[in-house]
UniProtKB/Swiss-Prot annotation:
<dbReference type="InterPro" id="IPR002150">
    <property type="entry name" value="Ribosomal_bL31"/>
</dbReference>
<feature type="binding site">
    <location>
        <position position="18"/>
    </location>
    <ligand>
        <name>Zn(2+)</name>
    </ligand>
</feature>
<feature type="binding site">
    <location>
        <position position="37"/>
    </location>
    <ligand>
        <name>Zn(2+)</name>
    </ligand>
</feature>
<feature type="binding site">
    <location>
        <position position="40"/>
    </location>
    <ligand>
        <name>Zn(2+)</name>
    </ligand>
</feature>
<feature type="binding site">
    <location>
        <position position="16"/>
    </location>
    <ligand>
        <name>Zn(2+)</name>
    </ligand>
</feature>
<comment type="subunit">
    <text>Part of the 50S ribosomal subunit.</text>
</comment>
<comment type="function">
    <text>Binds the 23S rRNA.</text>
</comment>
<dbReference type="GO" id="GO:0005840">
    <property type="term" value="C:ribosome"/>
</dbReference>
<dbReference type="Pfam" id="PF01197">
    <property type="entry name" value="Ribosomal_L31"/>
</dbReference>
<keyword id="KW-0687">Ribonucleoprotein</keyword>
<dbReference type="GO" id="GO:1990904">
    <property type="term" value="C:ribonucleoprotein complex"/>
</dbReference>
<keyword id="KW-0479">Metal-binding</keyword>
<keyword id="KW-0694">RNA-binding</keyword>
<protein>
    <recommendedName>
        <fullName>Large ribosomal subunit protein bL31</fullName>
    </recommendedName>
</protein>
<dbReference type="InterPro" id="IPR042105">
    <property type="entry name" value="Ribosomal_bL31_sf"/>
</dbReference>
<keyword id="KW-0862">Zinc</keyword>
<dbReference type="InterPro" id="IPR034704">
    <property type="entry name" value="Ribosomal_bL28/bL31-like_sf"/>
</dbReference>
Length: 71
């Protein structure tokens, strides 16, 4: 490998909107602002909300059940 052609690899702070600070190594020269991180994302915190699609499935089956009985 050639020497002196690669950018500097240094510590960088990624700051989330919840206040969590993550230190990572990168060639990016400025700090990074995040909207969500593993500390505040609903999937990781267990506050995930399941959307009930049962009504949509029943509506679809009701609409197209007439087509399957005609055959």
């Amino acid at each position: 490998m050639k020497t002196g052609i690669h950018p500097d690899y240094q510590d960088m702070k990624a700051t989330c909107s919840c206040g969590n600070v993550i230190v990572v190594r990168s060639t990016l020269k400025k700090d990074l602002n995040l909207d969500v991180c593993s500390a505040c994302h609903p999937f990781y915190t267990g506050k995930q909300r399941n959307v009930d699609t049962g009504g949509r499935v029943d509506k679809f089956n009701k609409r197209f059940s007439a087509l399957s009985t005609k055959k």
